[in-house]
């Protein structure tokens, strides 16, 4: 099982920096590099075909590492009140605040063999997390339907429904609305 964190990512980078053989997942990077693997930006080629290579931020510490961060909000420096196209393709910067993009998240989670973990921290430093033992986002044709398994953790995602999930219908401000 791979874990995918709710965090954001940069969708632009120089093509010259793509490694010859990008890994298929942050988990594969962690497994090959071991305990000293650093949390940073990496190139992924999820299908191993070099047809759809993109950059992600891999968290190599939380939950034993190997986690792909797909959304991060820290200081409000990135506007999240954007349209559907931005949420489909992604926006922001992997080094700061970002959203990976529904199409990339779908490609990374299409086998549903992933764990979804949401880590939260308030202004007083209080933390909580929610973890689902299965996570996937279906294709555009299926309106990026959210697939979630059983919940564990300190904070349940109030917008998410276990098992059936929901189809993403529109984006309002910083929330993705499910139906």
Q: Language-model segments: which ranges?
A:
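Mature extracellular or lumenal effector domains of secreted proteins
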Residues: 2-179
């Amino acid at each position: 099982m791979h874990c995918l964190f709710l965090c954001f990512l940069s969708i632009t980078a120089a093509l010259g920096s793509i490694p010859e053989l990008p890994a298929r997942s942050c988990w594969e990077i962690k497994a090959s590099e071991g305990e000293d693997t650093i949390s940073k930006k990496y190139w992924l080629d999820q299908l191993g075909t070099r047809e759809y290579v993109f950059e992600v931020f891999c968290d190599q510490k939380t939950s034993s590492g190997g986690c792909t961060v797909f959304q991060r909000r820290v200081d409000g420096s990135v506007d999240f009140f954007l349209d559907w196209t931005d949420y489909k393709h992604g926006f922001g910067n992997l080094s700061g605040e970002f959203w990976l993009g529904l199409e990339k998240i779908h490609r990374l989670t299409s086998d549903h063999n992933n764990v979804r973990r949401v880590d939260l921290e308030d202004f007083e430093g209080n933390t909580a997390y929610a973890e689902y033992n299965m996570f996937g986002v279906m294709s555009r044709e299926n309106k990026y339907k959210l697939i979630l398994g059983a919940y564990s953790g300190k904070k349940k995602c109030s917008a998410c429904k276990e098992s059936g999930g929901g189809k993403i219908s529109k984006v309002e401000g910083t929330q993705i609305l499910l139906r």
